[in-house]
Design a protein with these regions (language model features):
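Alpha-helical segment proximal to the catalytic Tyr-Lys
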Residues: 117, 168-169, 240
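Short, small/polar-rich loop/turn modules that mediate ligand/substrate recognition or access, typified
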Residues: 78, 171, 176, 242-244
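Active-site loop immediately N-terminal to the catalytic Tyr-X3-Lys motif
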Residues: 90, 144-150, 172-173, 188, ...
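Substrate-binding pocket helix/loop in short-chain dehydrogenase/reductase
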Residues: 88-89, 96-101, 212
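Active-site helix of classical SDR
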Residues: 112, 155, 163
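Residue(s) in the substrate-gating loop at a strand-loop-helix junction
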Residues: 139
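Short C-terminal tail/terminal secondary-structure segment
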Residues: 144, 220, 232, 243-256
């Protein structure tokens, strides 16, 4: 049975990814900053769960030690944990900037690096020649910066640069590194963003949602399962020759 570890798996996109990977036959290590969320999802799926703060290398190293002590390897790492706040550029504070970069950029870097250091020494997957796979959940804001999200967009641009550089350096070890760029996803975090944006723009939440829909050529809001499906593909053998890529899964909103 292949195994995977997903950060930020206690809710939203991360939970959907964990659920999909379990259906795909993976043993999934469910991790989250909030231990009770990780426990709830882990118990629901019958999978191990860990409290992990991705901004703390010690937490990530402890998680790696648990995984390798029990399983001896890690086939797939999904760096999903992330945060978002919203504010006009002229009103942004250093604290907001630092918070977004600490989790989205530094947290993704620490997560990928910590597990890649162990992956390089493990044997390839049977019959595939790939040692392991790293997937980072970025955002369409990493391709097309968004108003009110200068700090968030910049932190996700950093993730794409990290993915490309890591893909080049880890290719000789036969470790693939890719990103997924979601758009307007129906999650609790998105609901908070809708409320913030409505307040900042003087609109109702319903008007903000309709604006999102107008910007999405395929005409609906994204579900967490849409993102999970792309991660499932990247985890499988059909994606073994893909690395350094950022897959847009946002209904075409990024080209609007």
């Amino acid at each position: 049975m292949p195994n995977a570890l997903v950060t930020g798996a206690g809710t939203g996109i991360g939970r959907a990814i964990a659920e999909r990977l379990v259906r795909d036959g993976f043993k999934v290590w469910v991790t989250d900053l909030k231990e009770e969320w990780a426990q709830e999802v882990g118990e629901a799926l019958g999978m191990p769960h860990l409290k992990v703060d991705v901004t703390r290398r010690a937490d990530l190293e402890q998680a790696r030690e648990r995984v390798y002590a029990e399983d001896g390897r890690l086939d797939l790492l999904v760096a999903n944990a992330g945060v978002s706040t919203m504010n006009p550029f002229l009103d942004l504070t250093e604290e907001e900037w630092d918070f977004n970069f600490a989790v989205n950029a530094k947290g993704t870097f620490l997560t990928l690096q910590t597990f890649a250091r162990a992956m390089v020494a493990q044997p390839p997957m049977p019959g595939r020649g790939v040692r392991g796979k790293l997937v980072a959940i970025a955002s369409m804001a990493a391709r097309q910066a968004a108003p009110l999200l200068a700090h968030y967009s910049a932190s996700k641009f950093a993730v794409l640069g990290l993915v490309q550089a890591a893909a080049k350096e880890l290719a000789p070890y036969r470790i693939t590194v890719n990103a997924v760029n979601p758009g307007f996803v129906r999650t609790s975090m998105q609901e908070r963003e809708v409320a913030w944006e409505a307040r900042l723009r003087g609109l109702t939440p319903e008007e903000v949602v309709q604006d999102y829909l107008r910007q999405t050529p395929l005409g609906r809001l994204e579900a967490p399962e849409d993102v999970a499906g792309v991660v499932s593909f990247l985890a499988g053998p059909d994606a073994d020759f893909i690395t350094g890529e950022a897959v847009e899964v946002n209904g075409g909103a990024w080209i609007f």
